């Protein structure tokens, strides 16, 4: 099975947890892009849900496939958030934000009673950090913010390249108008301390470490099995 087929398997399994009248968070990324059309089929067959999307692209997909969309302003508490991940580490710690929607993804996850991560087995890691950590920053004073990030990382024994994410010749902008640094630090052995250090920097808006948010991971394996994991399974 190829990776896209595995992503679709995980998305199909996630649908089993969606019930009538649920308020759903809809994440972003390639695996969620497989989930949205499948959810649209269920809606067309009578499933009643209301959804909040974490990115403009996911919202557009929901409209395309007939998935009802609302906002957190109208429904500030959600039953279930379905999202992907760039890495799934010990105790279901995550790195997210490769697509640039990390701030909205974290807001929606925090507003949800449960967050289920859907992924293929390539996203499972023993230690976070092989995937670059996205750090969303305010455009004002980004060079000063970068220096502060480097110092915070150095204090935790982390070193490596920090690059400003680009979109052609211009900096990539998030839906919220922020920029993103991608930090290539390798193994992140103290994610909680790193999270606290980054959030203490005034120019940092949010980062891609999702700690204590995911309650289950639905992982499609290469042998066609699907594992439904909880944090203590890691």
UniProtKB/Swiss-Prot annotation:
Keywords: Isomerase
Biological processes per GO annotation: D-ribose metabolic process; pentose-phosphate shunt, non-oxidative branch
Binding site for substrate: 28-31, 83-86, 96-99, 123
Coiled coil: none
Top-level division of the source organism's lineage: Bacteria
Catalytic activity: aldehydo-D-ribose 5-phosphate = D-ribulose 5-phosphate
Pfam families, sorted: Rib_5-P_isom_A
HAMAP family linked to this entry: Rib_5P_isom_A
Family according to the record: Belongs to the ribose 5-phosphate isomerase family.
Function recorded in the entry: Catalyzes the reversible conversion of ribose-5-phosphate to ribulose 5-phosphate.
Self-association state and partner proteins as the record states: Homodimer.
Protein name in the entry: Ribose-5-phosphate isomerase A
Organism listed in the record: Bartonella henselae (strain ATCC 49882 / DSM 28221 / CCUG 30454 / Houston 1)
């Amino acid at each position: 099975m190829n990776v896209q087929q595995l992503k679709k398997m995980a998305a199909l399994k996630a649908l089993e947890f969606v019930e009538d009248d649920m308020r759903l968070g809809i994440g972003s990324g390639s695996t969620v892009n497989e989930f949205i059309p499948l959810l649209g089929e269920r809606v067309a067959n009578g499933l009643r849900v209301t959804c909040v999307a974490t990115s403009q692209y996911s919202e557009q997909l929901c409209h395309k496939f007939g998935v009802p969309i609302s906002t957190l302003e109208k429904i500030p508490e959600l039953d279930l958030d379905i999202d992907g991940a760039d890495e799934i580490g010990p105790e279901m710690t995550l790195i997210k934000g490769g697509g640039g929607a990390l701030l909205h993804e974290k807001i929606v996850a925090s507003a949800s009673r449960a967050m289920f991560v859907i992924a293929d087995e390539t996203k499972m890691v023993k230690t976070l950090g092989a995937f670059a950590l996205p750090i969303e920053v305010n455009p004002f004073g980004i060079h000063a913010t970068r220096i502060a990030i480097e110092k915070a990382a150095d204090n935790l024994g982390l070193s490596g390249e920090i690059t400003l994410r680009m979109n052609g010749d211009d900096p990539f902008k998030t839906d919220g108008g922020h920029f993103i640094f991608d930090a290539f630090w390798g193994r992140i052995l103290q994610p909680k301390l790193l999270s606290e250090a980054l959030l203490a920097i005034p120019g940092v808006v949010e980062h891609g470490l999702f700690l204590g948010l995911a309650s289950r991971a639905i992982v499609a394996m290469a042998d066609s099995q699907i594992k439904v994991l909880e944090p203590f399974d890691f």
